[in-house]
Amino acid sequence: MAKNFLIELGTEELPPTALRSLAEAFASNFEAGLKTAELSHEGIKWYAAPRRLALKVTALAEGQADKVVEKRGPAISVAFDAEGNATKAAQGWARGNGITVEQADRLKTDKGEWLLFKQEVAGKPVQELVMDIAAKALAGLPIPKAMRWGNSDIQFIRPVKTLTVLLGDELVEGKILGVASARTIRGHRFMGEQEFTIDSADQYPAILEERGKVMADYDARKAIILADAKKAADAVGGIADLEDDLVEEVTSLVEWPVVLTAKFEQVFLKVPSEALVYTMKGDQKYFPVYDADKNLLPNFIFVSNIESKEPRHVIEGNEKVVRPRLADAEFFFNTDRKRPLIDRLAELDQAIFQKQLGTIKDKTDRITELAGYIAEQIDADVEKSKRAGLLAKCDLMTSMVFEFTDTQGVMGMHYATHDGEDEQVALALYEQYMPRFAGDTLPSTGISSAVAMADKLDTIVGIFGIGQAPKGSDPFALRRASLGVLRIIVENGYNLDLTDLIGKAKELLGDKLTNENVEADVIDFMLGRFRAWYQDAGFSVDIIQAVLARRPTKPADFDQRVKAVSHFRELEAAEALAAANKRVGNILAKFDGELPAEIDLALLQEDAEKALAENVEVMTEALEPAFATGNYQEALSKLADLREPVDAFFDNVMVMADDEALKKNRLTLLNNLRNLFLQIADISLLQK
């Protein structure tokens, strides 16, 4: 009879940012193990709290089903000699399976007849299997760095304290990670019973919540935090900033969530909200509260891990903790504004960007020139772009950014505004880091875009130029920077060429670079980011590969090609023309020699080749405007009309004719046909 199954691993505090992924991987790995072991079940639910990982399997089979295993032996023609006696091959096979040749069955198919051994194998009870399945599931967790504890060589993400494995009300005995299975479960450190025994898997997780004051259901904890935080914010007339990453982290930090509201002095609101929010969210894991106009309120919401009889004391304690940090931010803000940003420019010479690439001042000089160069091409104000480039990194020398590093850029904007800098120049200091992550907002102006691209391109070309292209790790975030440049160009429709931009960045870096192939390497790298981007957007790999084969270096143009090929692929003629292009490519690849530049009309003999030649000539002229303007969708839609003459050509014309002149003429025709498509993409790479 199927029973519910429970495994709980009690540990020391698990890394909060990894808790969900650990639990999900544990469940996935364990379920895969059950499938491999052929153990049926109705479902698996994972549980995770700061000091435990658990799985509950509903209706787990009591064991494997009995089955018959068939082992095929040698063919009858090999198993017996001409006199019908068993050969050594047959005898050896039979002996290996513990039978005689006479006891073997026969397997007959339309392909022949073989000796066959049928063995009945009894299924193992689940108790003999689950400990090994669990151990393998835990061994397969995504643990970046395991640790040892005590005198043991056993490694896990954190020291393991308890293990409970129950099948119904039966304790499954065994050890995992050096800990023996027992009925003891640990509760909350400060509430409920710190240790108690569990009698049955069916009691979990309710017994843990009732007696141990631990809410093991991760999603339930998260739901409580979200609901109560929204109510708490509403109570003070605001809206809580419930960023999912922070909510997830807080959920992973508490076993018994209690949402409370605290406040801070109104005077701190004179400090830019970003600095206050940084310390609230980053340092303290608090949720800021805003009004309807997105102005920060002097309140914050936090989640306590204990249900106190005196919540006021808990609130006051948290207010006392955050107050000095906010006071620091206020002090830094007031102190930093006593000097204009531009006065800090020389100090950038004291900060190293990268040993071979120089100081941040060196980088600033390069950004300034490159931003002006880009601005000219995208019709942005050149002088303002250069001014923004010059000021871009000055806030790194301020006390605020030194203490609260994530405020770089935004504090530059505030300080520049205070200094009386142009509004768009100040904004560019903030937006230079955009986009900061996948899906993030792009810079909102041409000036900001020019500075953002200049900063990223200088880093990309510089790091590639000294031979430090990212492999496994990416310490300079070049993948993100590359995608950022591509997004800015594509989504704004800028007519920029990567070859030109990379060449200019290389020129500004000068003799600091040692990689002679830096331009080609960077283009390959950035085009590779295109592949990931379009795959995420839902475009199939073959469409992307078809465009990549042409190596277009204008990102906006690349985008038009991908969308055009995607549209073309849906046309009725697409599959046949893709196959024809592949056939043409194969034929041309086999020809070793030079082809005439033009078709000799006098050598056209068959009606089908005359028709195709005429169509190719007409199409070549008709498509010139579309190619010139990058209207690739229109071009491919027209090229789809070539399906019938192409099919007729291959049905009626022998390309590789005995007559050399005739053969070359036909190959030239096919080459011209293929070149029409290659002006957009290599559609021969499209799959069915």
From Swiss-Prot:
Keywords: Aminoacyl-tRNA synthetase, ATP-binding, Cytoplasm, Ligase, Nucleotide-binding, Protein biosynthesis
Compartments where located: Cytoplasm
SUPFAM superfamilies: HD-domain/PDEase-like
GO molecular function: arginine-tRNA ligase activity; ATP binding; glycine-tRNA ligase activity
Catalytic activity, as annotated: tRNA(Gly) + glycine + ATP = glycyl-tRNA(Gly) + AMP + diphosphate
Pfam families: DALR_1, tRNA_synt_2f
EC number of the protein: 6.1.1.14
Quaternary data: Tetramer of two alpha and two beta subunits.
Name the record gives this protein: Glycine--tRNA ligase beta subunit
